[in-house]
Design a protein with these regions (language model features):
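Conserved non-catalytic scaffold segment of RNase H-like nuclease domains
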Residues: 1-70, 84, 91-110, 116
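Acidic active-site catalytic centers that drive phospho-/nucleotidyl reactions
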Residues: 53, 74, 121
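Short gly/pro/ser/thr-enriched loop/turn and capping motifs at secondary-structure boundaries
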Residues: 76-80
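Acidic, divalent-metal-coordinating active-site segment for phosphoryl/phosphodiester hydrolysis
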Residues: 117-128
Length: 128
């Protein structure tokens, strides 16, 4: 857990279920980013709408020496490609209407209980 050093806004509590006491014992953002950078090194990153996560990380990393250059796979784009190139073309409009992580979990019959919960989102994304 990361302690942002600022008050956790109500939206963070509602959407991500993060309470102030959840982050109080967390590590500082700089330490978390250093650990993350070391962990991902040259690995392929996978995410749902992964460009959003990458943009946030690039902004937080700040200087050019640490910019992320990892290859990335976006599960939303993979799903879109499958729809456009697979046997489901007749359902394309309906299937493309909602490509949220929860919607894709439903389409692919994956258990998904709690959106915007980091571990749950990561687990479902990995299964996609």
């Amino acid at each position: 857990m990361v302690n942002p050093g600022v008050h956790v806004p109500a939206a963070g509590v509602l959407v991500h279920k993060l309470r102030p006491n959840d982050v109080e014992q967390g590590i500082p953002p700089a330490e978390a980013l250093a650990e993350l950078r070391q962990f991902i090194e040259d690995k392929v990153l996978v995410g749902h709408f992964v460009h959003i996560d990458l943009n946030v990380l690039r902004k937080e990393l700040g200087d050019e020496r640490h910019q992320l250059s990892n290859p990335a796979i976006d599960t939303a784009r993979v799903h879109r490609w499958l729809l456009q190139n697979g046997p489901w073309k007749e359902d394309l409009e309906q299937q493309m209407a909602n490509i949220s992580l929860a919607a894709l979990a439903g389409i692919y019959n994956l258990d998904f209980h709690e959106a915007h919960h980091a571990l749950e989102d990561a687990f479902v994304t990995a299964r996609l």
